[in-house]
Regions:
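Core catalytic region of metal-dependent phosphoesterases/phosphodiesterases
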Residues: 14, 18, 23-93
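Conserved beta-sheet core of the metallophosphoesterase superfamily
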Residues: 167-228
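Divalent-metal (often Zn2+) His-rich catalytic cores of metallo-beta-lactamase-fold enzymes
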Residues: 132-153
Length: 231
């Protein structure tokens, strides 16, 4: 698995991105229907945290098998990997964060999810006519995308991955410094009432997995679509 992945521009349809899903795939399906998502030509990019908290977490494997769906590895995917592969995981914390469904699975089924999660990159770069758009789960430890790319490809330092998957610093500090080398960087992880843009960093987790709504962003235009689900 490459921790960094570059994807060519979509020449047939639209590329859309969405915030944290957390097992609410049916709500997301409604949102996509409202923006006329066409899986035969369109693609959907996720900032990670596909699972935990919501009732349809097991559907993550079905979505990841679709050729039009692409995701980075979030901290909840990383927790599942750590649990099965001998890492240190506070099980009480993991259950409180919605991981009980995974812990209850037979080990063979856990392995199927972990294999899929291990195949997810930490960082995605999607080409658009107006310039590249990056995706991470939480934040970039560098204000230069090239530095992050090279670090993930050649160094693979745990502290770099930790920032990419767990950091809330940018939002907490109101850091407006852009990440150079990108037109926009799309992240989730920290819930916000409405999409927040700091510099060129878009925070997309608007709580579609709880009482909020999914925010869907078109990559080519950076146009925000925020349909509210009915369930």
């Amino acid at each position: 698995m490459s921790r960094y992945r570059r994807i060519a521009a979509n020449t047939r349809g639209r590329d859309l991105a969405v915030g944290d899903i957390h097992g609410h795939f049916e709500r997301l399906r409604q949102c996509l229907a409202r923006v006329n998502f066409d899986p035969s030509v369109d693609r959907l990019f996720s900032v990670g945290d596909l699972v935990d908290r919501g009732p349809y977490s097991p559907h993550a494997l079905e979505w990841l098998a679709q050729p039009w769906f692409h995701a980075v590895q979030g901290n909840h995917e990383a927790l599942a990997i750590s649990h099965l592969r001998g890492g240190r995981v506070d099980l009480d914390m993991y259950r409180a964060a919605g991981g009980g469904w995974f812990l209850a699975l037979p080990k063979a089924q856990q392995e199927a999810f972990v294999e899929a999660f291990l195949n997810l990159p930490i960082a995605l770069e999607v080409q658009t006519a107006a310039g590249p758009v990056g995706l991470l789960h939480a934040d970039s430890p560098f204000n230069d995308w090239t530095l992050l790319r090279d670090s993930l490809l050649y160094d693979d330092e745990p502290q770099v991955r930790e920032v990419c998957q767990w950091s809330r610093r940018r939002l907490k500090e109101g850091d407006h410094h852009p990440v150079e080398g990108l037109r926009a960087l799309l992240v989730g992880h920290t819930p916000v009432l409405d999409v927040q843009v700091l510099g060129n960093v878009w925070h997309l987790d608007t709580g579609g997995w709880r009482s909020g709504h999914f925010s869907v962003l078109e990559l080519a235009s950076l146009k925000l679509l925020s349909p509210a689900p009915s369930v």
